[in-house]
Amino acid sequence: MFVEHNLIKNIKIFTLAFTLTVVLIQLSRFISPLAIIHSSYIFLAWMPLCVMLSILFIFGWRGVVPVLCGMFCTNLWNFHLSFLQTAVMLGSQTFVVLCACAILRWQLGTRWRYGLTSRYVWQRLFWLGLVTPIGIKCSMYLVGSFFDFPLKISTFFGDADAIFTVVDLLSLFTAVLIYNMLFYYLTRMIVSPHFAQILWRRDIAPSLGKEKRAFTLSWLAALSVLLLLLCTPYENDFIAGYLVPVFFIIFTLGVGKLRYPFLNLTWAVSTLCLLNYNQNFLQGVETEYSLAFILAVLISFSVCLLYMVRIYHRSEWLNRRWHLQALTDPLTLLPNFRALEQAPEQEAGKSFCCLRIDNLEFMSRHYGLMMRVHCIRSICRTLLPLMQENEKLYQLPGSELLLVLSGPETEGRLQHMVNILNSRQIHWNNTGLDMGYGAAWGRFDGNQETLQPLLGQLSWLAEQSCAHHHVLALDSREEMVSGQTTKQVLLLNTIRTALDQGDLLLYAQPIRNKEGEGYDEILARLKYDGGIMTPDKFLPLIAQFNLSARFDLQVLESLLKWLATHPCDKKGPRFSVNLMPLTLLQKNIAGRIIRLFKRYHISPQAVILEITEEQAFSNAESSMYNIEQLHKFGFRIAIDDFGTGYANYERLKRLQADIIKIDGVFVKDIVTNTLDAMIVRSITDLAKAKSLSVVAEFVETQQQQALLHKLGVQYLQGYLIGRPQPLAD
């Protein structure tokens, strides 16, 4: 039963393909443009070749026999040849065509006859547009040397002048390069009428859309008018001389605006009209050489048209590719914030979840950028299996990821993700890294204007969440979060304004030894709205927004101005100034500080530079270089908050420091805590071995003062010694 079904199917396919071959070959012979050279008719485009290729493209190997039978019957009918002559002529016409198709099948695989205008275009152009016409002509020459044919067609088999052969060969090129797709679309629409709708929707209707409709209609109108003028029986030198170039210009303008199938069809129909009704188009073409030149021009422009379209589509593809790459983080390969901004309305009603990696910034400073990328990729690999198919993950600037969740139980799912992340280490270069995570979530309404404030509020809330690793919901805290983020922004603007206007207030707190000698530490305040802002409010924002170097330089310059107007004969230090850690990371900061002192003619011995405690340097070499340059210039270096971390010992070992300032955490309970006393004793012994001075901070009682002096501390600082007073006083 199955075999019978296949047999019936193959018979139907053979009948359809054979009928189409016979009918379309007769049609193609009828519409093929003709010319007369040396009293012999010659085709300007041999369109039966287009019919053969169209049948083979549509039916594949099942079209081989129908093509052979159809060509045999039409040759027998049209030329009244003997059976042998018909068979030999058939072989010369079809052998090279079938071989070229077989080579394409071998090179391109089973898809060799699909996507004719989009894929493997140049391979088909070479084998079918170049090799096949040359092969057919060589085959006919070879056959003509062994067999005799009627005078009517003998010129096609070599019994003609060279120019006749040239025009005949050009007619084969013209057929394949210009009219092949015209017959392919016609044949395919006959086989499958539904293809007409596909062709219209895919390749023609887009040109009639709202944006291109005016251009397309104007283009078609101009082409129609031009064809009417060129094809009219009325001969005119003006039409023939000036309007023919416009014909090529019109099609050049269509590149980029019209789809190639639409452009190719109009080009084929237009050239067919011009070659058949050629009173004006071929006016003045009186020799076969001129005719060969005209055909060569049409062939060349057809190839150029195809090339221009391919180049345009490739540039469009590259633009789309570059646009997509601009929407993707190049290192983590996650969609970035720009991708989120493209179509925010698509995410309306979904939950936006901000996941913060708390210590990623610090870790990346120590281990490098690639560690940061590795961590984000590891986190993504952990999160993606926990997300649904339509949920997304975005890379946000900084240390945050954005999860767009659409399922229920958002807070519970997000908390589960955070718990999993907090329970795992990320391994980098055989080192396990403990990363801290926090998250916050809120509903997004799809409004572009609310996207930025929402992300800002979620970011702040996620940062608060890192302290206890509990997910926070924005819905219940929106007012509070909005107030906090607005307050932070206003505070930052206030700080910037104060720095721009130089609204600094310098306070001095005494640092004294047993004899009451010493120097004062400079403490800065900011003036704003008639009030004073203390360091605990503005220093975190100054560090966070990279204003450290600017702030420290302004403090130093204000102090130097005061020193320049209040000279003193005292030798040794008069003040100390604390430099923030990020200031020392500036490569040229040492030179700028030195230039300030030279400008105001202040000796570097007058000011001690204090280095604040920091858990680790992101670029220790830059800091060490700056400190070394300052030390060489003559500054004395003090290490602040000494004893609270390994970094201080590491600094002490590498730096040529002059002073150690013991952190107040070891001083406040030193009278009652013997361990604090032992720590202070070890620090003073270490300082004595390196010939360093020691300063103790937060000294508030006489008992602390007495014990610290007994333990070897030379200088004391605190409310007992003196409270900060305005420098102007």
Curated annotation (Swiss-Prot):
EC number, as in UniProt: 3.1.4.52
A GO cellular component entry from the record: plasma membrane
Cell membrane is among the record's keywords: yes
PROSITE patterns recorded: EAL, GGDEF
Domain of life: Bacteria
UniProt catalytic activity: 3',3'-c-di-GMP + H2O = 5'-phosphoguanylyl(3'->5')guanosine + H(+)
Gene3D superfamilies in alphabetical order: 3.30.70.270, EAL domain
Biological role: Phosphodiesterase (PDE) that catalyzes the hydrolysis of cyclic-di-GMP (c-di-GMP) to 5'-pGpG.
Protein name: Probable cyclic di-GMP phosphodiesterase PdeA
Organism: Escherichia coli (strain K12)
Encoding gene, per UniProt annotation: pdeA
